[in-house]
C-alpha cells in the first residue's frame, strides 16, 4: 500500500518519480495569474496567525465549511477569534476526503511548516500553535514564503485605475533574490456597463487619467493612457473575466448611444449590453496587440448566485458556480476578426465548464502561427484546479494540440500558501507521462520526457510571456 503525502505522492511508478524529482521539482515558479495583494508583497507582510495566512480570503475553504454546516461567523465573521475559525476549519478537513482541499491542506502543512500530521479536531490545537510559532520567524513573511517555494515571478491582478505604487516601490527596493512582481491589466469594471456602479467607475477613471469622459471614445483614450502607464511599469499581460464571448454586430454610433445611456443611468437592453461588451473586448484586444501583451480570457462562471450573501459579503466570497454557455461560434468570430485585422496577440483561453475542453483545444489550432503555442488552452481553472480537472484539460490538449508547448500552471490564488499547487500540478503531469511509458504508449526516453516536463513547468512560460 502506498503512503499518503510521502515523497512519491501521486507518482505511480519509477518513471513518474524520476521525472518529478529530477526534472519538475527543481524548476522555479512563474505564477502568471494570481490575486495576491501587492501591498503584502511590497511590505513583506508578517502574518499574525495561521488563520490570517490560510483562511483569510479563501473562499474554497469557506465554501467547504458552509457545506459542513459551519456558521458564517466562523468563515467571514469579525467577532470570532483566529483560533475559533481555525478550529472550525480543522473540524471540516476530515470531511473533505476526495476534495482537492484535503490534498492542498496537507501539502501546504508539509511543505511550508514541515508538519506531516493529519489536520483534525484532535490535532488542531497542536498544529495551530506550531504554525503560529513558526510564523514569527522572518522566513515565514510574504516574501520569505515566496522564496521558500522558489517563486521567480508573480503577476497580480490590477484594475486600470490602480496607481501601481506598490509595484513601483517594490521594483525600486527589492533585493536581488526577491521574486519579481508584475502588474496585470484587468479592466472588467470598464466592461461591465450593466452594473449600477459603472458611472462611478467612469468617474474614477476620469480622475486618474486626466481625461474628461462623456463619450465611449473618451473612455478609450483614458484607458489607453492607463494601458501605457501599466506598460511603462512592466505589465505585459491582460485578463478578462467574462461569462461568454459576444458576437453581436454594432456600429460606432450605436456604441456611443449605449455608453451615453449608461452614464445617464438608463436601463440598457440585453442586446445593447452584449454589443458594448463585444466592442469593448475588441478594443482591449487591439490595444494589447499593439503593446505586444498576452491576453487571457476566463469564461464560463455564473457569479454571485446568492443575492442575500452577495449583499452581505460582496463578490468573491464563495457563491459562484459553473455556467453553461453556447459560445463556440462567438469565440471563433472574435478571434477571427482580430486575426483578419492582424491584431490577434498571444492568447490564453480558460473555461470553467470542462464540457468545453475539446471546444477550446480544437479552437487553438485555427489561429496558431508565428510562434510556438501562440494560442493557449489555460490550465484547469477554479473548480477544475484538481487532479481530475487537470488531467482532463491536459488530455484534451494532448490529443488535439501540443501538450509540449503548454505554459503550465498558475495559482489563481489570494494565498501565499498556494504555491504547492504548482508542485501538485507537476506531480500529476509527471504521473500522466510515467503511466503512458509504463503502458508502452510513450518511449522511455528520459531526456525527451525530462525536457518536456521542464518546459511545461517553467521554460515555456518564461519564453511565452517575455517578462524578462
Where are these regions (language model features)?
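Divalent-cation-assisted or electrostatically stabilized phosphate/pyrophosphate-binding catalytic cores
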Residues: 325-331
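C-terminal amphipathic alpha-helical interaction region
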Residues: 295-297
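Hard-cation-handling environments
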Residues: 306
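A short acidic, glycine-rich active-site loop
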Residues: 269-270, 319-325
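Short, basic/hydrophobic alpha-helical segments
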Residues: 334-340
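Metal-cofactor-binding active-site regions of metalloenzymes
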Residues: 2-291, 343-345, 349-354, 358-361, ...
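Short glycine/proline- and charge-enriched loop/turn segments
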Residues: 310-318
Amino acid at each position: 500500500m502506498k503512503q499518503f503525502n510521502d515523497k512519491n505522492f501521486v507518482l505511480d511508478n519509477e518513471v513518474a518519480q524520476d521525472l518529478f524529482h529530477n526534472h519538475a521539482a527543481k524548476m522555479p515558479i512563474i505564477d502568471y495569474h494570481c490575486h495576491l495583494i501587492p501591498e503584502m508583497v511590497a511590505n513583506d507582510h508578517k502574518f499574525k496567525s495561521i488563520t490570517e495566512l490560510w483562511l483569510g480570503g479563501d473562499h474554497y475553504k469557506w465554501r467547504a465549511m458552509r457545506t459542513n454546516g459551519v456558521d458564517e461567523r466562523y468563515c467571514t465573521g469579525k467577532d470570532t477569534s483566529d483560533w475559533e475559525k481555525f478550529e472550525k476549519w480543522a473540524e471540516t478537513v476530515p470531511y473533505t476526503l476526495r476534495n482537492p482541499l484535503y490534498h492542498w491542506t496537507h501539502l501546504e502543512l508539509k511543505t511550508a511548516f514541515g508538519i506531516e500530521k493529519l489536520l483534525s479536531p484532535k490535532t488542531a490545537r497542536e498544529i495551530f500553535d506550531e504554525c503560529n510559532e513558526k510564523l514569527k520567524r522572518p522566513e515565514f513573511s510574504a516574501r520569505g514564503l515566496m522564496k521558500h517555494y522558489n517563486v521567480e515571478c508573480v503577476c497580480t491582478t490590477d484594475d486600470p485605475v490602480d496607481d501601481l505604487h506598490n509595484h513601483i516601490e517594490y521594483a525600486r527596493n527589492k533585493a536581488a533574490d526577491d521574486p519579481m512582481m508584475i502588474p496585470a491589466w484587468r479592466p472588467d469594471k470598464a466592461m461591465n456597463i450593466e452594473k449600477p456602479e459603472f458611472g462611478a467607475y467612469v468617474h474614477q477613471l476620469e480622475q486618474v487619467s486626466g481625461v474628461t469622459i462623456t463619450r465611449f471614445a473618451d473612455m478609450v483614450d483614458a484607458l489607453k493612457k492607463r494601458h501605457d502607464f501599466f506598460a511603462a511599469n512592466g505589465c505585459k499581460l491582460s485578463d478578462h473575466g467574462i461569462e461568454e464571448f459576444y458576437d453581436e454586430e454594432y456600429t460606432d454610433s450605436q456604441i456611443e448611444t449605449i455608453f451615453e445611456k449608461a452614464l445617464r443611468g438608463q436601463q440598457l437592453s440585453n442586446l445593447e449590453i452584449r454589443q458594448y461588451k463585444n466592442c469593448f473586448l475588441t478594443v482591449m484586444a487591439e490595444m494589447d496587440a499593439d503593446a505586444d501583451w498576452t491576453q487571457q480570457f476566463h469564461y464560463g462562471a455564473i457569479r454571485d448566485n446568492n443575492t442575500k450573501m452577495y449583499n452581505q459579503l460582496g463578490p468573491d466570497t464563495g457563491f459562484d458556480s459553473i455556467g453553461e454557455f453556447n459560445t463556440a461560434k462567438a469565440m471563433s468570430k472574435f478571434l477571427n476578426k482580430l486575426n483578419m485585422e492582424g491584431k490577434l496577440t498571444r492568447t490564453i483561453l480558460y473555461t470553467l465548464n470542462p464540457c468545453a475542453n475539446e471546444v477550446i483545444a480544437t479552437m487553438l489550432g485555427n489561429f496558431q502561427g508565428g510562434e510556438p503555442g501562440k494560442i493557449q488552452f489555460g490550465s484547469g481553472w477554479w473548480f477544475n484546479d484538481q487532479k481530475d480537472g487537470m488531467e482532463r484539460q491536459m488530455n484534451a490538449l494532448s490529443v488535439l494540440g501540443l501538450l509540449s508547448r503548454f505554459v503550465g500552471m498558475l495559482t489563481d490564488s489570494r494565498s501565499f500558501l498556494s504555491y504547492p499547487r504548482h508542485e501538485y500540478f507537476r506531480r500529476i503531469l509527471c504521473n500522466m507521462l510515467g503511466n503512458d511509458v509504463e503502458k508502452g504508449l510513450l518511449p522511455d526516453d528520459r531526456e525527451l520526457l525530462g525536457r518536456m516536463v521542464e518546459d511545461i513547468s517553467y521554460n515555456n512560460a518564461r519564453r511565452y510571456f517575455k517578462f524578462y
